[in-house]
């Protein structure tokens, strides 16, 4: 069974995903890392080819990742693609959220191309995507103040037992 983590930039999807995968004995796939490994930095892709090109590369990475029995962390904007939304309808999807206050230190100095203005841009992006995240999510966790190990244990239990 594929477990998918979605949520805004800086919410902890990658860190949680690695921990959950270890607990479940599954591979971990971070679709942003897959794109970077094959095509260079996300900032570079945005600068040279634009967001639309990046989203096309991301879609290929998502489609491939979802074909595996793995824990998969999607980039924050991957859910904007209608095919990806359709693909997630039949999967266990964990929405990983974080407050604006908690994300400030996580994104400080970030080279993420959509965060040029920091937390205010982050909050705008989150609000523009929130309804999609919530519609796709099977269950939601907040990483603002709880230890990631505790959250990873809960998600692993949920993945195995459905509760």
Residue ranges and their predicted role:
Residues 8:
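P-loop (Walker A) phosphate-binding loop of NTP-binding proteins
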Residues 15, 19, 23, 120, ...:
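NTP-dependent small-molecule kinase module
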Residues 29-87:
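ATP-dependent small-molecule kinase phosphotransfer cores
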Residues 39, 58, 66, 107-108, ...:
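Short, flexible helix/strand-to-coil boundary loops that buttress conserved ligand/catalytic motifs
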Residues 76-79, 99-101, 146:
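Short glycine-rich anion-binding loops that position phosphate/pyrophosphate groups of nucleotides
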Residues 90-132:
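A glycine- and Lys/Arg-enriched "phosphate-lid" helix/loop adjacent to the NTP-binding pocket
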């Amino acid at each position: 069974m594929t477990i998918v983590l979605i949520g805004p930039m800086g919410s902890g999807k990658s860190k949680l995903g690695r921990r959950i995968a270890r607990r479940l004995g599954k591979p971990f796939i971070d679709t942003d890392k897959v794109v970077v490994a094959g095509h260079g930095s996300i900032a570079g892709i945005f600068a040279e080819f634009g967001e639309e090109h990046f989203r096309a590369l991301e879609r290929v990475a998502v489609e491939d990742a979802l074909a595996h029995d793995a824990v998969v962390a999607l980039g924050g904007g991957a859910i904007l693609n209608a095919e990806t939304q359709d693909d997630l309808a039949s999967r266990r999807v964990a929405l990983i959220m974080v407050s604006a206050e908690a994300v400030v230190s996580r994104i400080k100095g970030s080279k993420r191309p959509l965060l040029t203005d920091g937390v205010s841009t982050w909050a705008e992006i989150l609000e523009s995507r929130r309804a999609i995240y919530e519609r796709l999510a099977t269950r939601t966790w907040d990483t603002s103040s709880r230890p990631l190990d505790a959250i990873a244990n809960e998600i692993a239990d949920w993945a195995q037992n459905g509760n």
